[in-house]
A protein has these predicted regions:
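A residue-level marker of the well-folded mature domains of exported/periplasmic proteins
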Residues: 42-53, 57-382
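Secretory targeting signatures
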Residues: 1-69
Length: 382
């Protein structure tokens, strides 16, 4: 009996040993956990691993793109010296950014430089963050600094208002002032009582000649008998005393309408018209709030230009280069036109006295003629 038990136990032990050995060889990877290499060839494994790594990289790229797309979009605005409250380019540029914020959801940061020397630093500060889909620089005197900074940050989009630089990442926004000036000339030609109208320019350069050419053509289109006096030029942008002297001389010569495109020098010309009680026309922005003798201003719709550039940047269609906007693009006009009234009333908190109906109708006719191509406005750049 004892021998039988011993034999049985020995048999069981042998079976266990044999079973364990068989299990080890049949399931060699149960401990540790099996890997992909245990079931496929080395070449297949390497291929699968490469495909897996590529998929992970694509996923990471997609996640980064989603984060970029969902990140709030912002614009940087570098105002001209003088800051907000200038009732000029700064205020209307700010209005364009505010319109983009309200309509497109694009927020904006802005700075108010105190001196031209600060432009380059502010441009670089904005560009180096990489946070802005567009950086907008207001006024011609930012051009020199921008040509430097734009070259340093070729992937950053910039827009420059009222001047041209040649960097490929800068949209240079200019305005066909001759077209808006044509409408001013129509008004002067229709409303003159003496039959003579005058013009005071800042400098005798093509830019300012462009204003005069449109003004003269508009006056003669509306009134073939009108005499448009030869233009006079201050020779400076910030000499209102000289501007006033030149305008006073024109008035003494019988001109009862003064159109001024002379920067701060032009304020003196408008003051002379006010003191002498003759019609006056402002420029760039609606300056009609200055004096009751103001009967219109040639307007550069910087707000529209700024808004369009922000929209292009937002949807990925921004392109650097030269942009010229006129009446067709709604970049220039005259502030007595009904479509412009709400903007100027909001900015300047005053309401115009309406133009006489026959004058307004003639201005609208001229505007429509320019739009249709029936009227070709001469330019000072010829």
């Amino acid at each position: 009996m004892a021998q039988t038990s011993t034999t049985l136990i020995a048999g069981i032990m042998i079976a266990l040993v044999i079973g364990a050995a068989i299990g080890w060889f049949v399931y060699p990877a149960m401990n540790p956990t099996p890997s992909l290499e245990d079931y496929v060839s080395k070449a297949s494994y390497n291929q699968l691993k490469a495909e897996s790594d590529a998929a992970k990289a694509q996923l990471a790229t997609a996640q980064a793109e989603i984060e970029e797309l969902t990140k709030p979009k912002k614009v940087g605005l570098i105002l001209a010296t003088g800051g907000l409250g200038d009732k000029s380019f700064n205020d209307i540029s700010f209005a364009g950014c505010q319109m983009a914020k309200d309509k497109l959801g694009v927020d904006f940061d802005y700075v108010e430089p105190n001196a031209i020397a600060e432009y380059e630093g502010f441009q670089r500060d904005f560009a180096m963050t990489g946070d802005y889909i567009l950086i907008i620089c207001i006024a011609f005197d930012q051009a020199e600094a921008l040509s430097i900074v734009a070259a340093e940050y070729p992937e950053q989009n910039f827009a420059l208002v009222d001047m041209v630089v040649n960097n490929t990442n800068v949209a240079s926004l200019t305005f066909r002032a001759n077209e808006g000036s044509f409408l001013v000339g129509v008004t002067a030609g229709m409303m003159t009582e003496t039959g003579k109208v005058g013009f005071v320019g800042g400098m005798d350069i093509p830019l300012i000649r462009d204003f005069f050419e449109g003004y003269e053509a508009g006056a003669k289109w509306a009134n073939p008998n009108v005499v448009v006096s030869a233009p006079v030029f201050v020779g400076a942008w910030a000499d209102p005393t000289k501007g006033k002297e030149l305008a006073t001389t024109l008035i003494e010569q019988g001109n009862d309408a003064i159109y001024s495109a002379a920067g701060k020098s032009g304020l003196g010309a408008l003051e002379a018209a006010h003191e002498e009680g003759v019609m006056a026309f402002g420029v760039d922005l609606c300056q009609d709030y200055l004096y009751p003798e103001m009967v219109g201003s040639m307007t550069k719709r910087v707000d529209e230009a700024v808004y369009e550039m922000i929209l292009d940047a937002l949807v990925g269609k921004f392109k650097g280069g030269f942009y010229s906007g006129g009446i067709k693009e709604k970049w220039v006009g005259m502030c007595r036109l009904p479509e412009e009234e709400p903007l100027w009333e909001e900015l300047f908190k005053f309401k115009h006295q309406p133009l006489p109906a026959d004058v307004l109708n003639k201005v609208k006719e001229a505007r429509d003629g320019i739009l249709s191509g029936e009227i070709t406005v001469p330019t000072g750049y010829d």
